[in-house]
């Protein structure tokens, strides 16, 4: 359910989660557990959902992007064995900084034009985690790669 919510926000939409009460007015145990788990995750990571929108970045197999002001959020559902998350940024966009929402700074390496690797920490995450990217986007980017002239 959480992945569906994140997917909807990453595409510029929203999602309504509807739990219908039983005849006695109570909710099913499974529904209560789902709502509690979503609420717990949102308390820690809601910054990547609330007031966020479509980022316009190429989707990667590890998860989704959302966007708010000068930040892009990486919501990681599939942690790669390589411990490297590939991030392909739009033209003239640079990643300035990457931090987990708990404040831990991440190592970012530019690997090619418009492509970075973000090193995943050694922590054992039991649920999807979020990395906040501070970005700079301008026509006068200091990118060291140049367009090929043909």
Regions found by a protein language model. Give the residues of each.
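Mature catalytic domains of secreted/periplasmic carbohydrate-active enzymes
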Residues: 1-150
């Amino acid at each position: 359910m959480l992945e569906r919510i994140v997917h909807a926000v990453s595409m510029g939409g929203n999602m309504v989660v509807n739990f219908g009460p039983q005849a006695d007015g109570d909710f099913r145990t499974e529904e209560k557990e789902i709502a509690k788990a979503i609420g717990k995750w949102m308390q820690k990571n809601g910054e990547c959902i609330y007031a966020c929108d479509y980022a316009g970045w190429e989707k990667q197999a590890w998860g989704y992007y959302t966007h708010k002001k000068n930040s892009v959020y990486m919501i990681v559902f599939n942690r790669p064995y390589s411990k490297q998350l590939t991030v392909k940024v739009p033209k003239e966009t640079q990643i300035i900084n990457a931090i987990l929402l708990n404040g831990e700074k991440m190592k970012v390496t530019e690997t090619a034009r418009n492509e970075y690797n973000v090193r995943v920490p050694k922590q054992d995450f039991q649920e999807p985690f979020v990395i906040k990217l501070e970005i700079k986007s301008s026509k006068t980017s200091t990118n060291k790669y140049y367009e090929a002239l043909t």
